[in-house]
């Protein structure tokens, strides 16, 4: 039986610009490019936008949802000590939430999850925890010896008609990212890259999220236990609506009854011991 070798991640040939834009200020040119990108994303054949069910976030995403045939990146936020391990679970959980929203629209399909023996995160996904968002029986785990094998498996998976592809990597690989983005666009299958280290500002990904765990609000009768909270930043939104904030950020809380994430109101961001500031009317 022949052995299939991983694809060489060679950069695609770049096409030169036919002409330089004339008479546009940098801000005007940037906004014009963004409009073209949004129009291009909305016109992609066979692709849909999946709402996250969080109005504040959906309002910034293209057509009010997450683009299916695209590459999305999720970073673990830095812990106070400088280590990211403390927030691995938050990044994994947010990824599982995104997958759950996508799978709500699909009754069938497998999720291909690729990682290395010494993965970017401390431990592989935990099936009972994933069951909060989707049936873990739909998960197919692939362990790759080398990072290039991991990217090869992801690209092959995007061509295989499955529901979604996830890969864990320690650092950004621009060439691999371009190939994955093109494969996702062609197949209409979403690809997710979970990264331990922050990536470059410029990227082909449709969205980039940074997720960190946050202190939960204690539930009466359960001591210090409370619903999970994550601090989520949308650090790149290639086809979406520009935000008034340079990097929009939300404190999200999981609701076990509604099975939804919701933005925590600003009044509930404070700790129990923090003093209230009272302003005269």
What is each PLM-predicted segment?
Residues 1-113, 123, 129-137, 240, ...:
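Detector for small/aliphatic-rich hydrophobic stretches
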Residues 75, 113-115, 140-143, 165-169, ...:
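Conserved beta-strand segments of the P-loop GTPase G domain that flank and frequently precede/overlap
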Residues 99, 154, 180-181:
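Generic hydrophobic/aromatic pocket-lining and core-packing "Φ" positions
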Residues 108-163, 175, 185-187:
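Conserved nucleotide-cofactor-binding alpha/beta core module
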Residues 117-120, 172-173, 198-200, 238-239:
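Conserved nucleotide-binding/hydrolysis micro-motifs of P-loop NTPases
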Residues 121-124, 201-204, 242:
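Switch/connector loops and helix/strand junctions flanking conserved nucleotide-binding motifs
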Residues 162-218:
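A contiguous pocket-lining binding segment that forms or flanks enzyme active sites
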Residues 211-281:
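C-terminal functional extensions of proteins
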């Amino acid at each position: 039986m022949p052995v299939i070798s991983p694809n060489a991640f060679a950069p695609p040939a770049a096409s030169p610009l036919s002409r330089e834009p004339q008479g546009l200020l940098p801000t005007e040119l940037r906004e014009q490019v963004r409009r073209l990108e949004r129009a291009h994303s909305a016109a992609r054949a066979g692709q849909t936008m999946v709402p996250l069910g969080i109005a504040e976030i959906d309002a910034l995403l293209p057509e009010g949802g997450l683009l299916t045939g695209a590459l999305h990146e999720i970073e673990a936020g830095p812990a106070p000590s400088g280590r990211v391990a403390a927030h691995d679970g938050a990044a994994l959980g947010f990824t599982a939430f995104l997958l759950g929203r996508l799978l709500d629209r699909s009754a069938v399909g497998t999720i291909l999850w690729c990682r290395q023996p010494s993965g970017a995160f401390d431990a592989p996904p935990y099936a009972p925890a994933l069951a909060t968002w989707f049936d873990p029986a739909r998960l197919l785990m692939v362990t790759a010896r080398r990072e290039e094998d991991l990217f090869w498996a992801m690209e092959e998976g995007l061509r295989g008609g499955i529901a979604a592809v996830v890969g864990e990597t320690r650092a950004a690989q621009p060439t691999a990212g371009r190939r994955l983005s093109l494969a996702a666009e062609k197949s209409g299958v979403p690809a997710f890259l979970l990264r331990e280290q922050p990536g470059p500002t410029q990227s082909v990904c449709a969205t980039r999220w940074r997720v960190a765990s946050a202190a939960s609000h204690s539930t009466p009768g359960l001591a210090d236990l409370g619903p999970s909270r994550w601090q989520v930043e949308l650090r790149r939104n290639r086809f979406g609506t520009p935000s008034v904030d340079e990097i929009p950020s939300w404190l999200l809380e999981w609701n076990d009854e509604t099975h939804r994430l919701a933005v925590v109101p600003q009044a509930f961001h404070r700790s129990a011991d923090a003093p209230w500031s009272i302003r005269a009317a």
